[in-house]
Swiss-Prot record:
Species per Swiss-Prot/TrEMBL record: Cricetulus griseus
BP term (GO), one: high-density lipoprotein particle clearance
Pfam families, alphabetized: CD36
Record topological domains on the Cytoplasmic side: 1-11, 462-509
PANTHER family, A to Z: SCAVENGER RECEPTOR CLASS B MEMBER 1, SCAVENGER RECEPTOR CLASS B TYPE-1 SR-B1
Coiled-coil residues: none
Coarse class of the protein's main subcellular location: membrane
Record GO cellular component, one term: cell surface
Protein name per its UniProtKB record: Scavenger receptor class B member 1
Length: 509
């Protein structure tokens, strides 16, 4: 009896443990998604107490700026009206450092800041040095000529004489460092003196002179602390709720984030929208496919073909016009009127007429498309590669002799890639806290549910076996009683009178 009672209590105990495991597993299945969501919301908002605040304040990911130049091979022939021939040079790679300063939390659930950036040349990653000479179109001459096309003959003559006096030509041979970070040009002083409204440029002239040791303006974005639906969205840039560069309300809108973090809990129907001060506009990327980066699930977002499409191909872009062929965006309105165009490298995703007009271009989606890999649960970028090209529209301008017989063409100057991938300690921390732990908890809840189900079977099986033993014992007892009754009945039948007579008769025989 002692052993049987002990076994019964063990079975009951295991059943109770199983019930608790099953209940805990069910509770975790029901509650865990909500808890994870709350933790994510708590740690992706812009708040000093959140896990992502330090990452937001000073990006720990190493960013690189890689620049590729389109060196002009036949400048003399271009002046005679022949097709341009270019040769790609580079990359010239710079390490980019960013950190936010003047961080001010406002009463309306927003935070204001400026982001300082500095660039440092990386010889070991580059194909060449900053002292390399490259032949490019002289933007001040050829760009200025297009800007002067509608001016009076007198102004054009003055410009021609000024260029000749200063020794300015249609194409220049300058170093990488000068082209990017600026050089002293007497023509800039000439323009500022005689045509002050043409180029509001002071000091050095360079394509990226405003990108180094500078900032991209004062951003005010929503923190998501009080209103999660607006997390990371830009409220104002330099105090503006919209820009005034373009010709439609929609194109002037400041939409999306500042381009560093997005709202969490993305789906394939989500899009990445951000405002780019360099492009003077908001841009939208669309979902391409799902993937994995260093064990972390990601969504890849890429640029749709409509990003730089002209108004005839994509009517909402009409506000960015006047336009030329589809696939390039005229940014002259935010670049002092200079005939500069923005596009994908090598005119990828643009009208083939553009790449066919210049020899040496080979658009390739694997080399020239841009992408951002985002962790969909948190909205934090894991890996990115943003590639853009700057081109100059050049042509012969009557009255300005330096332009010769140049045929109208959009001539690429350079393309650049801004890339970065999370790695090292930030990646390990991110993976452990936001990927590994939720996965472990997910496995635990199902293990508890399965274990609970198995343990609940123990008392059930014990009860069934106990009933079976009782049935066998009862069946054996009943059979024994029936045998005894049969023997007794047989004995009594032998002692009855009828039975005795029969026995005597048989004896006589």
């Amino acid at each position: 009896m002692g052993g049987s009672a002990r076994a019964r209590w063990v079975a009951v105990g295991l059943g109770v443990v199983g019930l608790l495991c099953a209940v805990l597993g069910v509770v975790m299945i029901l509650v865990m998604p909500s808890l994870i969501k709350q933790q994510v919301l708590k740690n992706v908002r812009i708040d000093p107490s959140s896990l992502s605040f330090a990452m937001w304040k000073e990006i720990p990911v190493p960013f690189y700026l890689s620049v590729y130049f389109f060196e002009v091979v036949n400048p003399s022939e271009i002046l005679k009206g022949e097709k341009p021939v270019v040769r790609e040079r580079g990359p010239y790679v710079y390490r980019e450092f960013r950190h936010k300063a003047n961080i001010t939390f406002n009463d309306n659930d927003t935070v204001s800041f400026v982001e300082h950036r500095s660039l440092h040349f990386q010889p070991d990653r580059s194909h060449g040095s900053e002292s390399d000479y490259i032949i490019l179109p002289n933007i001040l001459v050829l760009g200025g000529a297009v800007m002067m096309e509608s001016k009076s003959a007198g102004l054009k003559l003055m410009m021609t004489l000024g260029l000749a006096t200063l020794g300015q030509r249609a194409f220049m041979n300058r170093t990488v460092g000068e082209i990017l970070w600026g050089y002293e040009d007497p023509f800039v002083n000439f323009i500022n003196k005689y045509l002050p409204d043409m180029f509001p440029i002071k000091g050095k002239f360079g394509l990226f002179v405003e990108m180094n040791n500078s900032d991209s303006g004062l951003f005010t974005v929503f923190t998501g602390v009080q209103n999660f639906s607006k997390i990371h969205l830009v409220d104002r840039w330099n105090g503006l709720s919209k820009v005034n560069y373009w010709h439609s309300e929609q194109c002037n809108m400041i939409n999306g984030t500042s381009g560093q973090m997005w709202a969490p809990f993305m789906t394939p129907q989500s899009s990445l929208e951000f405002f780019s001060p360099e492009a003077c506009r908001s841009m939208k990327l669309t979902y391409h496919d799902s993937g994995v980066f260093e064990g972390i699930p990601t969504y890849r977002f890429t640029a749709p073909k409509t990003l730089f499409a002209n108004g005839s191909v994509y009517p909402p872009n009409e506000g960015f016009c006047p336009c030329l062929e589809s696939g390039i965006q005229n940014v002259s309105t935010c670049r002092f009127g200079a005939p500069l165009f923005l596009s994908h490298p090598h005119f990828y995703n643009a009208d083939p007429v553009l790449s066919e007009a210049v020899l040496g271009l080979n658009p390739d989606p694997r080399e020239h498309s841009l992408f951002l890999d985002i962790h969909p649960v948190t909205g934090i970028p894991m890996n990115c590669s943003v590639k853009l090209q700057i081109s100059l529209y050049i042509k012969a301008v009557k009255g300005i002799g330096q332009t010769g017989k140049i045929e109208p063409v959009v001539l690429p100057l350079l393309w650049f890639e801004q890339s970065g991938a999370m790695g090292g300690e930030p990646l390990n921390t991110f993976y452990t806290q936001l990927v590994l732990m939720p996965q472990v908890l997910q496995y635990v809840q199902y293990v508890l549910l399965g274990l609970g189900g198995l343990l609940l079977l123990v008392p059930v099986i014990y009860q069934l076996r106990s009933q079976e033993k009782c049935f066998l014992f009862w069946s054996g007892s009943k059979k024994g009683s029936q045998d005894k009754e049969a023997i007794q009945a047989y004995s009594e039948s032998l002692m009855s009178p009828a039975a005795k007579g029969t026995v005597l008769q048989e004896a006589k025989l």
